[in-house]
């Protein structure tokens, strides 16, 4: 069962899931800070799912504005236990419902995962790659 999470202790369990994500650029501290700020700003929404007392998925949404000032809902962090593949669809549907509730025009996410993996997992929900980010790392 998926529920909205407002328990700061539970946020620590969610940040622990970052350890299971290969090549995650989001740090535990940053993710935790986002979730805590959501308790006060109503711009971050954290959802969690449990089966038999064990976390099997989580979703962190961030409400922001894009470059032209339109509201955008960002999938900041999604983790789903490999034994529950259908849970991703439920989380995407929650994000869609939240976007409709907030009258948001776009849902987006940033990932450094392989394009083929992302296409296979999210194209069926209507997500499309709309741009590429080119960056220079400054050391």
Say what each PLM segment does.
Residues 1-30:
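Short amphipathic alpha-helix that is part of the acyltransferase structural core
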Residues 36-48:
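A short helix-loop-beta-strand connector motif used in the catalytic cores of GNAT acetyltransferases and
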Residues 43-44, 122-128:
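Short glycine-aromatic motifs
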Residues 46, 50-84:
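Conserved donor-binding loop and adjoining core beta-sheet/short helix segment
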Residues 110, 128-139:
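Conserved catalytic-core motifs of GNAT/GCN5-like acyltransferases
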């Amino acid at each position: 069962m998926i529920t909205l999470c407002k328990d700061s202790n539970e946020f620590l369990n969610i940040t622990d899931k970052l350890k299971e994500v290969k090549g995650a650029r989001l740090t535990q501290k940053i993710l935790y800070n986002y979730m805590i700020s959501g308790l006060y700003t109503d711009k971050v929404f954290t959802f969690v799912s449990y089966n038999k007392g064990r976390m099997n998925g989580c979703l962190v949404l961030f409400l922001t504005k894009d470059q032209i000032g339109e509201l955008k809902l960002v999938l900041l962090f999604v983790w789903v236990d490999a034994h529950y593949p259908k849970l991703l669809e439920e989380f995407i549907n929650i994000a869609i419902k939240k976007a409709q509730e907030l009258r948001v025009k776009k849902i987006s996410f940033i990932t450094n995962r392989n394009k083929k993996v992302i296409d296979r997992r999210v194209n069926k929900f209507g997500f499309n790659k709309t741009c590429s980010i080119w960056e220079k790392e400054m050391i």
